[in-house]
Amino acid sequence: MKSLQDITMDDGSTQYVELFNTKNNEWCKNEFQITHQVTMIGKYENRYDVTLLINGLPLVQIELKRRGIDFKEAFNQVIRYKKHSLNDLFRYVQIFIISNGIDTKYFANSDKEMDFQYTFYWTDKNNNRIDNLYDFALDFLPKCHISKMISRYMVVDDTQKNLMVMRPYQYYAVEELMKRAYETNNNAYVWHTTGSGKTLTSFKLSQLLSTNREVAQVFFLVDRKDLDSQTIEEFNRFQKDTVDMTDSTDTLIAQMKDSSKKIILTTIQKMSNACKNDKYQDVIDRFEGKKVVFIIDECHRSQFGEMHKMIKKKFPRAQYFGFTGTPRFAENASQDGRTTADIFEKLVHHYLIKNAIADGNVLGFNVDYVRTISSTVDIEDDEEVEAIDTEEVLMDDQRISNIVDYVLKIHNSKTNNRRYNAIFTVRSIPMLIKYYDEFKKRNTDLKIAGIFTFGANEDGELETEHSRDSLERMIKDYNQMFDKNYSTNTFSAYFTDVSKKVKNTELDILLVVNMFLTGFDAKRLNTLYVDKRLKHHDLIQAFSRTNRIETANKPYGNIVCFQTNKKAVDDAVKLFSL
């Protein structure tokens, strides 16, 4: 609908017609009309309440109920319309609005089965909900705004053939960053809590910036510890082949030479290598004097801070836009003392965990604290915990054995009889190996795997074997469990397959140290076992692996802490709920 439509005329010639004006700042030039009580006859006769026509096409459908009646009835009515009579021109409907006067929500017209979970309240920029129909109409339905929503903020999921409309906080974030890009050369960042759809927001920003002639290149940077394969899959869901993942620094440079590649997704580390290596200087020099935008995913990561100065030298006109669910403040500053604001300057929009829980976009947490050391030690006292926080105590055979027994005892109840699954994060590779071997002794029917990165040279962390050998053992067990043929030489493929198995609940428990604790989304993951000390952003990021919305069978994310104490949890929640 947004592109030119070819129409064959009576004389056989072809004319191209623009059905909808999508040009910047020309949205208001579309023609708007309102019609009431349109009757459509399909399998049954249905009468639609209010239809907004734009250039003669029914693009917005509004269904109303009387005050006091649950407005979900209007949603159910839309479902009936789609089944029985919403055809012909009404297939062009982009947005549905439902209201009982007091509560009002909007949602996209999807070919997929509709779910009330994906209906949204509109808000102001400060996340204050606009419930009342009159106020909603004043804010959401002005000609320019509704046209902009349809032309800019609808996204087609090419994989699932699903039409999506962006949520208000996503809209405001992109609008603010676009304004920042077009009107200034200054940096900025967005603080949207984990699980709130930052990938979609950053994709839309990348897409819109890439169409601007003033922007020579958009780089989307992720950390190699995160699931860059997951990110690229999501990007290409939203627009097929919009972005290619760079496999090496040479591939990155080749893409930078290709002027048709306006969006390049790569890792922070590959970009850092490109900037360091003199042999790539001639390609990087091509961007001198040109406006380049770097969009940094999970920008609280210290790695970007370390390479920021180098990139700044190589790309003097670059702007940096960061996305994070857990910014760095003075309390959790990076090792060099810098905060997120020190690098990215201005916070242009926030949507906090308390907002997301209130809106039903993510779940809350149910946290258990399990004493595993000594009843004479006050687990709430940080100083005493530090005093006993030694490898010898924490790696004690009996302690590990007791925790494994406890996990096996509670796992079925925590995961709703294995409808869901769990990640078990521990403090070190030696501890992970010890847990893996302890689980294996039990001959449990739980499907358990382990994953970690190994170093080429190690300082005798393990007395009996190099960690790579231990990982090789785990992969061998995994191969037998799932009839695969991975090894440490094909670690990337193993990593990808483990990711899929967790998402599909084919694994019951995945043992990790740091992997999978940031950027990994799996709706069927509902439990996190924690035998390490977490705080601040690391705590919120790890806990948030469990809080993706699924069904009523998943009311919250389960957290079972064997070291992290209540004060650390309370402090982290307070810090990121300001």
Mark where each language-model region is.
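Interdomain helical connector at the RecA1-RecA2 junction of SF1/SF2 helicase-like NTPases
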Residues: 332-421, 436-445
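Conserved RecA-like ASCE ATPase "motif II neighborhood" in helicase/translocase motors
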Residues: 263-296, 301-310, 493-499, 512-514
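ATP-dependent helicase/translocase motor core
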Residues: 1-217, 226-242, 259-262, 269, ...
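Conserved C-terminal RecA-like helicase domain
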Residues: 391-512
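Conserved helicase ATPase motor motifs in RecA-like P-loop NTPase domains
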Residues: 193-194, 298-301, 314-333, 360
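Short, conserved "post-DEAD/DEAH" coupling segment immediately C-terminal to helicase motif II
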Residues: 80-84, 301-319, 546
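Conserved segment of the helicase C-terminal RecA-like domain
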Residues: 545-576
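A short beta-strand element within the Helicase C-terminal
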Residues: 512, 516-541, 557-561
